[in-house]
Structure formats: structure tokens, C-alpha cells
Amino acid sequence: MTIIPSFISTSQVQASTTSVAAKALGIDVASYQSADLSAHAKAGSQFAIVKVSEGTSYRNPKGASQIKSAIANDMMPMGYHFATFSSNASLAKKEAQYAISSAKALGLPKGSYLACDYETGQGNIITNGKSVTAKAILAFMDEIKAAGYQPLLYASSSVLQNNINTPSIVKKYPNSLWVAAYAISGRVDKPNFKYFPSMDGV
């Protein structure tokens, strides 16, 4: 799948492709990984989900290079933001706005997927209740949508089932889930497509 950026009058880069074929292979990367994604493209990756931001102050220093490398290697670029808003809808909106500004600054084409990475860590509390948590996540996703990006929600299958009112997410944003769930631990050399999708909304 090829992304061919085009420029419009506002100088905003627009994604020409905004969908991924079924069973396509891809990677997610952060500052821990290389800025050069060519090896992944040669191995068959058709998309790259790049960490753009975290909270309201961290921006991936390799993000621009990783997004640029994805595009140069015909990989569909996407982004994700590590959430720290717990179940606070007001803070979720602020984090979404920071994620949007980071995505734009790093060169993520408008129209691309931009995910909310919701998990424990960095003070993010996931045990405040399913409904209030879902409302905060939806507040984040609504901001992403309004800015011209496509919202996704990344979380483990356990968190999606036990800590979030996930049906309310999927009702508003169908097929918006990016699920972390593994049939086994350790190294897996070939994808097990019989295992995924693991739940509705993937």
C-alpha cells in the first residue's frame, strides 16, 4: 500500500490512502527503535504506527524521521499517543490537542490514523470505572476526528474487557480497536491470523 502525499493550499500534507488491507503486516515504533524503517518494509511491513507524543509535554524525537521513512518506503504512516489522562475527559481533550499538534509537527499526513494508547504507566490510572473511562477516551477520539485524523484505541484485551465500556467506543467508532493480545509468550515468526480479530471492533 503506497502513500503519496499531496500538498494543498494550506501546505497541510494529506494522506492519499486511509485504509489497510485485511491481513496486512505492519509495525509500531517509538524512540527506542531506529529512524530508518526500510528493513521493515523489505520484510513485508505495509504500515508503520509511530509514537508521536505522550501526556502534554513529550514528543517523539525520532517521530519525524520515522514518518518520513515510512512514506519513503511505501508504508502507510500512522501515529499514536500514550495517554496519561486516566478518566479525566477535560485532560483527555488537552492531550488530544497536544497529540494533534505533535502529529502535524512531525509530518503525519492529515487523514491518517492517530491512536490513543491506553494502558497503565506514567501515572495513567485505568481502574476508575468503565463508563467514565470510556467517556474520557471518546473525548480524546472526538478531538482527533475533528482535527481531520482517524481515531483508534489501542489497549490490551484485558483492559478493553475489564476497564473500559468498549461497546460504547465501538458504537461511535466502528472497527477502531487496536488490540494487544497474544496467544503465547515469546517469539512468533509468522502471524496467526486465526487468532485475530480477538473481539468486535478490531
Segments predicted by a language model, with ranges:
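Intrinsically disordered, low-complexity regions
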Residues: 4, 15, 38, 61, ...
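Sec-dependent signal peptide cleavage junction
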Residues: 2-22
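Substrate-binding cleft of extracellular glycoside hydrolase catalytic domains
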Residues: 17-147
